[in-house]
Regions:
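Generic helix N-cap/helix-start motif at coil->alpha-helix transitions
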Residues: 1-6, 34-43, 70-81, 108-116, ...
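N-terminal topogenic membrane-targeting module
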Residues: 1-38, 61
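A membrane-cytosol interface segment of integral membrane proteins
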Residues: 38-55, 59
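Heptad-repeat amphipathic alpha-helical coiled-coil interaction surface used
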Residues: 8, 45, 102, 119-120, ...
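Residue-level signature for tetratricopeptide repeat
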Residues: 11-14, 47-48, 84-88, 122
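Long, hydrophobic alpha-helical segments that serve as membrane-spanning/inserting helices
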Residues: 117, 121, 126-148
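Soluble extracytoplasmic domains of inner/organellar membrane proteins
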Residues: 74-90, 96-98
Length: 148
């Protein structure tokens, strides 16, 4: 049942059917799932609700993400916090840290793409249109390289 509903969720997300996607997230998040499925679903829901600028649901999911343990849990929680601060709280005080993280990302195009996008948004929040456009373009170039 979970796999079928998860596929249905992905279909709603692809079609941008937000009403049904919300309903499916509510259903799936209410299930008692194995740890790895729960982690995957919570992160997917967090990314969705941050993109929808849903402050309440994003905050609840971020709180759960911060409780994850093992593996890359701490790094994932930190990156989710940066996303929340940037996209929900509209902050721009993480620019130096994001630039440092971008340098450390090296040849990791997926990570670079994500960090450049967050940097673009932080510069937008700051009101620096030129830097916003610069990092948005870089993010787009890495995105095309990743999807090629």
């Amino acid at each position: 049942r979970y796999n079928r509903d998860y596929l249905r969720l992905n279909s709603y997300l692809l079609r941008e059917d937000h009403k049904r996607a919300d309903e499916m997230f509510d259903l799936l998040l209410g299930l008692n799932l194995p740890k790895m499925q729960r982690v995957d679903l919570v992160i997917k829901a967090f990314n969705y609700y941050v993109g929808q600028e849903d402050r309440k649901k994003s905050k609840e999911l971020l709180h759960e993400i911060k409780g994850f343990e093992g593996g890359q849990a701490e790094a994932v929680a930190h990156e989710c916090q940066l996303m929340y601060d940037t996209m929900i709280l509209k902050r721009h005080n993480d620019i130096p840290e994001l630039e440092r993280m971008l340098k450390e990302a090296g040849d990791d195009k997926v990570k670079s793409c994500r960090l450049e996008y967050l940097l673009a948004l932080q510069y937008k929040n700051k009101g620096d249109e030129a830097k916003f456009q610069e990092f948005l373009e870089k993010s787009g170039q890495h995105s095309m390289a990743v999807n090629a």
